Amino acid sequence: IESEYLTPGAVLRIGGSLLVYCEIDLPQAMAAFAPLPRASLARLRAEALIDTVAPSELPVLIQGPTGAGKELLATRVHQKSGRKGALVAVNCSTFSKELIGSELFGHVAGAFSGAASNRTGLFAAANEGTLFLDEIADLPLEQQPALLRAMQEKKIRPVGSDKELAVDARVVAASHKKLSELTTAGNFRADL
């Protein structure tokens, strides 16, 4: 193709990358970033992309260096998504390896030593809202299948329970690490 006119929302595939064409109203986009000291063109582009992806039900991955504003972008995705529930944010690097399942999916009383009562997990807390998983690359490989199932099937099973619960939590994840490199090294699931 030598030339083609694009309309807003048009999707282009170039090699292994998908690009979405967006038109930006600069004054409106600048207002969205009023709390930030410097509204860069990159942030304005991010806001335009957020306008495109926020209404969908698809999971979102935000990659960038520490301090780049990934949580702010996740908050904007949630705000513009139209979802009624809460935005529940958690940093995956803070999870204890032994309690990740309980943190994400909850547990029933007696499920393990110290589980004296039922506990709602993060997925249930984000029901009808957004679950923001910061530093998703730090989630251990053995816990990734359960996360994938929760995202695909919209069902969770609290630790120690024999019953699944329906949840409608959209996942927005972020990482300063390149997940493609972790996938190649066998440390992160490609399907996640």
Segments (PLM) and residue ranges:
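AAA+ ATPase active-site-proximal loops
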Residues: 29-166, 171-177, 182-183
